[in-house]
Amino acid sequence: MTDRDALWAAILANPDDDLPRLVYADWLDENGSGLPSPDRESAADRAAAIRSQIEYARAEPFSPVARIAAEQTQRLVNTHRQEWGGHLREFAETFEFVRGFIGHVTIEAARSAQVLPAVFETDPIQAIRILRPAARDVWVSLEAVFEAVELRQVTTLELPFADMGATVEFEAMTDSPHLGGLTSLSLSGNPIPPEWLTEFLIGPDLPALTALDLSDNPHLGPAVTAGLVQAGHRHFTRLDLSGIIIRSEELKRILGSDAISGVEELCLRWGGWPNPGPLTLLDLGWVLPWDRLRLLDLDGHGLGPDGVLELLRKPATENLRWLGLARNGLGAEGVRLLAASGRLNLYYLDVRQNSLSPRDVERLRKRFPDAVIEW
């Protein structure tokens, strides 16, 4: 085994550890000139990509430092994508680099038995997205996917719009002996059985889970409420309930639940816009779980300037770095309130579809010079 092979093996064996990745970057700098083409020509760029993505992962989320590191990495990856990831094109629909190496892949459920062993053998993959065609003539059960032993190193599982509606598939997922280390789960856009969701949240399955995406499931309001208020054993740091029809009294109970008391990223995009969202009936400053909140998306609630004022009264808003206020009827007065706030220190602000003028946007840019302003 060559030194390069040994370093790569160490990365595969310790996917959470940055040290082997940084050692590999150093090795590329020192030995890249002796590699065969085309690795020789791209060795310095590969080392730089590893370091910049690790810098991104360690930086304060959404900060200018993180953005610069991400942009630098993207330029390098775009230049060398085929060279660094071409070996997976036969197996993966898409792939993404994480901390300098391919760490996220998208595969088709129908090919999982052939694809999973191949992709996990060559790269430190910890995140996987499963695609399943909706056409019934090519229907593929996901039960076999959840039996794959390769999933034991997966921490992020994404099943967006996979047409999962059968309880048996959800039970196969939660009963899988290979998903015990799962920390992030996306079930966005699936016809999730409400009874299953409530029982899952209350129950012991997937105990390491800290991030859950249930977005674009309008029917889940009562089920997610019943589950979260009884899920004191869970500790979510990221929760996406966007597009779920939730009544104000239900949302108040969710926001006060122990399960999300330490949430850092909370997405509550309202799917009933232009009708006002449930947050318009609540005191924003007091119902939101502020302790660790750094990302808050309130898209579509129609809060207006009064809602912005309620939001800004809470001192803990100083912890926010990402704020989504699209489709909230802010107008010039809402902009004035945001600009006058002495607490906010934002790196991202979404104010799309708020009837703002270029002057309003310029005022926000002046107030938040380090922020990306979407309008």
Model-identified regions with their sequence ranges:
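LRR N-terminal entry segment and analogous cap-like coil->beta motifs
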Residues: 65-175, 179-184, 188-189, 262-282, ...
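Leucine-rich repeat
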Residues: 89-93, 98-102, 110-119, 121-129, 137-147, 149-156, 166-175, 177-184, ...
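Concave beta-strand-loop units of leucine-rich repeat
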Residues: 104-115, 128-138, 156-165, 184-192, ...
